[in-house]
């Protein structure tokens, strides 16, 4: 009986704890974060151990949240008038002005023509595009339009964009011969 008790103590004392939280100043395996209560004068930091899986999950969650916020924000401007060179909801938007306005409102400052925006981020296959990614349209000589992906499934892709004919609107580009024939590529400027 004593040996069974000794074995139980030995097993439990050597088991790694999954909820270990360490604080310290010099641990190189720990992640450094500003304490939520810190100010410019108060430079205290908290340290806690994180696994790479936890970090990747947190980053993915934050990226997904930003993507959702961008799409929901863009949809709110549905019906806003088109204006060539327009960059605000009060005066109206052109396609690149609308895209720049939405992304800047969410902490990703971008501006410029569709051609300039196409040079940002990482190009992706059509099938890999996620909500919040940008899609570009035109012909072999020129990029003429940019839109924000609202949803992308195996069956259809919807975008939010500002068009000359209707201002800000949502379009299913999968069922549109016009948009399909002009589709060039997509770009991810959210993931880092």
Predicted regions and their residues:
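Post-signal-peptide N-terminal segment of Sec-exported extracytoplasmic proteins
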Residues: 32-89
